Swiss-Prot record:
It comes from Nitrosococcus oceani (strain ATCC 19707 / BCRC 17464 / JCM 30415 / NCIMB 11848 / C-107). Substrate binds at S240, Q262, H265, H331, D364, E418, H423. The gene is hisD. The keyword Membrane does not apply. Its EC number is 1.1.1.23. Pathway: Amino-acid biosynthesis; L-histidine biosynthesis; L-histidine from 5-phospho-alpha-D-ribose 1-diphosphate: step 9/9. InterPro entries: Ald_DH/histidinol_DH (IPR016161), Histidinol_DH_CS (IPR001692), Histidinol_DH_monofunct (IPR022695), Hstdl_DH (IPR012131). Catalyzes the sequential NAD-dependent oxidations of L-histidinol to L-histidinaldehyde and then to L-histidine. Zn(2+) binds at Q262, H265, D364, H423. Belongs to the histidinol dehydrogenase family. Its cofactor is Zn(2+). This is Histidinol dehydrogenase.
């Protein structure tokens, strides 16, 4: 038996009920905040000494000297050799596709020259150094390494520093192998808020970075939010989400498994199915009941579906689009006859998976698009991680002698209107006559 809340857009309190289902408290509790604040202060003040202490305390890693925290590149290559041929080839295929996709995103510098010779433009440059946080231990997320590292490499980032916790020295060869394929420059066996602090402030051994990307637990997310402003960050991600719109003509078992694919992340993950066909909603529910016992993470999935999973009945696809754009889902599947036409009407979604044969899991691993996506309705104003996140822009302005006369007079008038005399005179000193 699968328990999921069922809503109908025709019910009077539909939008209120939907908002309640979407609500998620993403703020860390006071204990977490206090702990993270203490860790950040210690790393900032005592550097490697504090980093070693926290690594020994939280990861049980007995290392006497901080330089031993760095994993040599030879170990990354050894990990790549140690994994199975099938895994190695899968990582390489995924890496090639991710690189190809992200090359299309790369922004270039541009400029134009006005008739009087004044030049205006924009110079695009990569960040110097980026830090990548990767969960470690028994969890293996090589896909996160590829998705975060490869766009940075395409952007031209000079140095990519990866941090990954290795509890009791346990290293994951898939993760290290992915780092080798992605061209990560340096890897350190540190994790948690202390790793974020080391990247943000720098220590004697860990270099300070310009931006920190990558997923992590509540302590990592809280640390990232606290150091933001001193360094850039990608985003503070919430639980994983999927919204599937189906017209009722796709195999119910396919849809059931698509919903499971996100619900298995954790109990806070959210899976929503939207359909104008009420009978189809019943069929998917029946399929989930059959398939759930076959899955290793069935308890996590069941809890996720019970707490946040939702089945929504709409009258037509126009109503479905209204709901989709309200939810602004992280992952959106359009399992309908003409998905491209429908996709053009979607205003808010992290990634749109079009057609009956496009499982969301393909995007998680190897389609080529990035799986780091805005969650918790932030797709209303945010975008997937991309090359542009690892580039920055500088404005270019060069006035010709003639241009300085025309623009100088305009600047003078506006500056004096604001009461900024030095601004005005700076422009006026270049005026002739």
């Amino acid at each position: 038996m699968v328990e999921m809340t069922r809503l109908d857009i025709a019910q009077g309190d539909f939008w209120l009920c939907l908002e309640q289902r979407l609500a998620w408290e993403g703020v860390a509790d006071e204990t977490v905040v206090a702990t993270v604040r203490e860790i950040l202060k210690a790393i900032r003040c005592r550097g490697d000494e504090a980093l070693l202490e926290y690594t020994q305390r939280f990861d049980g890693l007995e290392i006497a000297r901080a330089p031993e925290l760095e994993i040599p590149t030879s170990r990354l290559q050894a990990a790549l050799t140690a994994i199975s041929r099938e895994q190695r080839e899968a990582l390489q295929v995924a890496a090639e596709r991710i690189t190809t996709y992200h090359r299309h995103q790369k922004q270039e510098s541009w400029s134009y020259t006005e008739p009087d010779g004044t030049l205006l433009g924009q110079q695009v440059r990569p960040l110097d150094r980026v830090g990548l946080y990767v969960p470690g231990g028994k969890a293996a997320y090589p896909s996160s390494v590829l998705m975060n590292a490869l766009p940075a490499k395409v952007a031209g980032v000079s140095e990519l520093i990866m941090v990954v916790p290795t509890p009791k020295g346990e290293m994951n060869d898939l993760v290290l192998g992915a780092a080798a394929i992605a061209g990560v420059d340096r890897v350190f066996t540190v994790g948690g808020a202390q790793a974020v602090a080391a990247l943000a402030f720098g220590t004697e051994s860990v270099p300070r970075v310009d931006k920190i990307v990558g997923p992590g637990n509540m302590y990592v997310a809280t640390a990232k939010s606290m150091v933001f402003g001193q360094v850039g960050i990608d985003m503070i991600a919430g639980p994983s989400e999927i919204l599937v719109l189906c017209d009722g003509k796709t195999d119910p078992e396919w849809i059931a498994m698509d919903l499971f694919s996100q619900a298995e992340h954790d109990e806070a993950a959210q899976a929503i199915l939207l359909s104008p066909d009420g009978v189809f909603l019943d069929k998917v529910t029946e399929a989930m009941a059959r398939l759930l016992p076959t899955l290793e993470r069935q308890e996590v999935i069941a809890n996720s579906l019970r707490s946040r999973g939702t089945l929504i009945k709409v009258e037509n696809l126009d109503q479905a689009l209204e709901v989709i754009n309200f939810i602004a889902p992280e992952h959106l599947e359009l399992s309908v006859e003409d998905p491209q036409a429908l996709a053009s009407r979607v205003r808010h979604a992290g990634a749109i998976f079009m057609g009956r044969y496009t499982a969301e899991a393909i995007g998680d691993y190897c389609a080529g698009s990035n799986h780091v996506l805005p969650t918790s309705r932030t797709a209303r104003f945010s975008s997937p991680l991309g090359v542009y996140d690892f580039q920055k822009r500088s404005s270019l302005i060069q006035c010709s002698p003639q241009g300085s006369q025309t623009l100088g007079r305009v600047a003078s008038v506006l500056a004096r209107g604001e009461g900024l005399t030095a601004h005005a005179r700076s422009a006026e000193y270049r005026l002739k006559g």
